[in-house]
């Protein structure tokens, strides 16, 4: 006789249901906060497993990257084609303090800009900001008609395209290397750099739809908690205790 498990005897009663365990009981919610550079600081919420044993929830949250539409952060549909990446750098209670981690255009916006009868000009440059972030900036532009031009096409010569690219690189290096990452974010929202390039290239060939279409963070700067808290409108020197006044005197009892 073979020794083994008797399947007939081990069968349980029919109709018994397995205990349903809610997976969200082991998780907790955290609020994602954007820097004060943006008008709306409440980005959303994210989930993480609760701290158990040697596994700390904070370790799993730091370094998370979220992608948000700039229209949601600024409360304006004019920025609906721009995407911002935010990276979680610090956890305070149930709040996740983030910093800028990237910028990009939606693919449909880039495709809508490309049209016939015009030249496309692209340039990119790697720059270090004033606070030691290494970024790669991508710029895109298109030629347009001269004033009172009758000809339908607006194709630029290769020498003109090279001169425009040189101007693009010079302006991007100048505008980015002298500012911090937070100041650069403030320039990206109203497209200050794009207008500077358009103005500088006017003497070479008229341009239109000049945009910084992408910003990539290649290297993070050394983490500075004070700078991050200042970016979120908080102070690292706040004290919870109350200072005791110097007029305090010991009370001497006459009888013990």
UniProtKB/Swiss-Prot annotation:
GO molecular function: structural constituent of ribosome
Modified residues (N-acetylalanine): 2
Keywords of this entry: Acetylation, Cytoplasm, Ribonucleoprotein, Ribosomal protein
InterPro entries: Ribosomal_eS1 (IPR001593), Ribosomal_eS1_CS (IPR018281), Ribosomal_eS1_euk (IPR027500)
Cellular component annotations (GO), alphabetically ordered: cytosolic small ribosomal subunit
Family matches, as Pfam families: Ribosomal_S3Ae
Subcellular location: Cytoplasm
Major place of residence: cytoplasm
Cited PROSITE patterns: RIBOSOMAL_S3AE (PS01191)
Any one Gene Ontology BP term: translation
Family per similarity comment: Belongs to the eukaryotic ribosomal protein eS1 family.
Subunit description: Component of the small ribosomal subunit. Mature ribosomes consist of a small (40S) and a large (60S) subunit. The 40S subunit contains about 33 different proteins and 1 molecule of RNA (18S). The 60S subunit contains about 49 different proteins and 3 molecules of RNA (25S, 5.8S and 5S).
UniProt xrefs under HAMAP family: Ribosomal_eS1_euk
Name of the featured protein: Small ribosomal subunit protein eS1
Species for this entry: Komagataella phaffii (strain GS115 / ATCC 20864) (Yeast)
Record gene name: RPS1
